[in-house]
């Protein structure tokens, strides 16, 4: 295992992507500092939730992937890295409960 304990990373931006990067790096043993111009992190994510932000869809994975139409071949590898079920597990690991709406969308 590489020596990550002496490594540190500064992430500029406390939005969803910055926070996800911080979590991945921190779990790998890297010291992470997150900087944002706003006084609190994840504000856009929280505001999107007020409007009914869904995080994924509950349908069968193969069908889910077809929703990306012509872009599916380019996105498949990325989708396979974090399929909907695994995304829900990650959200639950953050202590956030989810529910499936009548449309099949998964909401926090």
Tell what function each PLM region has.
Residues 2-17, 33:
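Beta1/beta-strand and adjacent pyrophosphate-binding region of the FAD-binding site
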Residues 10, 26-50:
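Glycine-rich FAD pyrophosphate-binding loop
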Residues 18, 41, 62:
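Flexible, glycine-rich phosphate/dinucleotide-binding loops
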Residues 52-103:
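Glycine-rich active-site loop/strand segments that organize a redox cofactor
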Residues 105-108:
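P-loop NTPase switch module centered on the Walker A-proximal segment
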């Amino acid at each position: 295992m590489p020596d990550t304990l002496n490594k540190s990373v500064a992430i500029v931006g406390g939005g969803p992507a910055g926070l996800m990067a911080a979590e991945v790096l921190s779990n790998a043993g890297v010291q992470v500092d997150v900087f944002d111009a706003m006084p609190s992190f994840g504000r856009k994510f929280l505001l999107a939730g007020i409007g009914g932000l869904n995080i994924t869809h509950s349908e069968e994975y193969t069908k889910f992937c077809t929703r990306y139409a012509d872009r599916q071949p380019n996105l498949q590898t990325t989708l396979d890295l974090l399929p909907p079920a695994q995304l829900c597990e990650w959200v639950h690991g953050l202590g956030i409960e989810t529910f499936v709406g009548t449309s099949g969308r998964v909401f926090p």
